[in-house]
Amino acid sequence: MTAPQLPQMSTPGGPPAGGPVFAQALFGMADGATPPPARINAVIYGNSGVGKTAMVTALPWGTERWGDKAVYVAWDAGSETLLSVQPEDRPHLVVVTPKYQIKGGPGEPQRLVMNPYKAAMHIATADWAALVPGAKTLIWDGGTRLAEQILRAVANTGATVSPSKKEKGEETRLGLGDKDDPSYLALPIIPDYGMAQHAIMQWSEFLRQQPLNVLVVCVSDYYKPEGGSLESDTVGGPATVGVKIIPKFMKDWDNVWRMSLEVDTVMVEPAEKGKPVSFQRVNKRVLRTEKEGIWDSKIRRPAGGVNTLAKYEASNNWRDFWEKFDASGLGKEQ
């Protein structure tokens, strides 16, 4: 049985023959018999210091899925130094940092300022596949810091207060310092959280539209509904703005994985014969791709597929995880 003939799009050189014409169509079409290869999008979250950056940058370089280069968005201050990245992985990264702007008129002191939402959207919507030939992956480190900065920016600018209230001086927001100075600090109010959450969801939406694999690093937080029980209703996940957004943020991503340090006791053989064995406590780096307790995780798999990486204990290099992930068929199209 032959595949159905798809309608053809119009092109700048003129309409194609043999099918309907959609002038400047804002949609694409593909034959279901030969779908495009699936791109990986994942949020990796966990407490600070568990090795998330080393994990997301230890990719199987040079493979068809991951490419030989990755765009590494060093949003966390200091992450551009790549100290948390294994030396052998650093040459494969193209480091991108948010750019500060100089503010200050003639005769005024010049200061460095940044609009975090604007800068993040510039990065999220850039054509990285064209800017970095050979790159098939974008890594954002980290999403939590971006969310915190957006919330502060929304509060400091008073974006959620109506212009009429500002003119009348009816704004009830608590603030510290001069509003015209970069040092000004305002205490966020409830509408600020709503605005910042909306901004994060929009950033996340555009980021996932990149024609690349997308990996985002976050720290962890949890949401317990008022009146809910600790066991059944509390949801742990990646931290962004507030806690009510956690389930909503996670649902948009195909993969949400949690990293943690788990303490284990191992037996150590004696150095000399006849001496008793000893026991030593060690920290193991563990990645979970399925829910454990309140901590939510998920992994995309083909229909009927089995998750062989529900719990993964890291060796000296996280590249082994990614190779097993690719070999297992997880993350591929249905």
Residue ranges and their predicted role:
Residues G28-D31, G51-T53, M201-Q202, V243-K244:
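A generic local structural motif
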Residues G32-W140, T144-Q149:
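Conserved P-loop
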Residues A58-G62, V96-I102, R152-A155, D221-K224, ...:
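Short regulatory "switch" loops immediately downstream of catalytic or recognition motifs
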Residues T2-A33:
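N-terminal pre-Walker A segment at the start of P-loop NTPase domains
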Residues S297-Q334:
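NTP-binding/hydrolysis catalytic cores, primarily Walker-type P-loop NTPases
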Residues L112-P116, G134-T137, A186-P191, K244, ...:
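Glycine-rich, flexible loop segments associated with nucleotide phosphate handling
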Residues F206, L212-Y312:
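Phosphate-binding/switch region of NTP-binding enzymes
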